[in-house]
Amino acid sequence: MKYQQLENLESGWKWKYLVKKHREGELITRYIEASAAQEAVDVLLSLENEPVLVNGWIDKHMNPELVNRMKQTIRARRKRHFNAEHQHTRKKSIDLEFIVWQRLAGLAQRRGKTLSETIVQLIEDAENKEKYANKMSSLKLDLQALLGKE
């Protein structure tokens, strides 16, 4: 495993994930009966400051259909948490207008690259174009100077 699991921290993430899903109207318990489900949710809500007990609640009450989705969410959150510790792995965000993002995403898809790789490629293309333009301008001036002397 690449990233260390931190039980207390991850239990808090699991609690937040389950509460968010409950508030969005998803069934987070394995119970069909509404009163049993509500009772289990009430117990979960009372465990906010008891991260160690959250795992027990999950084993006992959680809807089995949520298991894989929650694991994926926690794994992604763990990765972001550890990557945020280092400047070179930390994700940055930029504000793009939707139409700009849409065009960039389309270009990235056509080129078979990620958005970041596409942006780097566009920057390199612009830098190369600038170097080419400077070189051509310099050659043009040299040629004019050479022709002007004769």
UniProtKB/Swiss-Prot annotation:
Its main location: cytoplasm. The keyword Metal-binding does not apply. It is found in: Cytoplasm. Pfam families: MatP, MatP_C. GO terms for biological process: cell division; regulation of DNA-templated transcription. Belongs to the MatP family. Homodimer. This is Macrodomain Ter protein. It comes from Shigella boydii serotype 18 (strain CDC 3083-94 / BS512). The gene is matP.
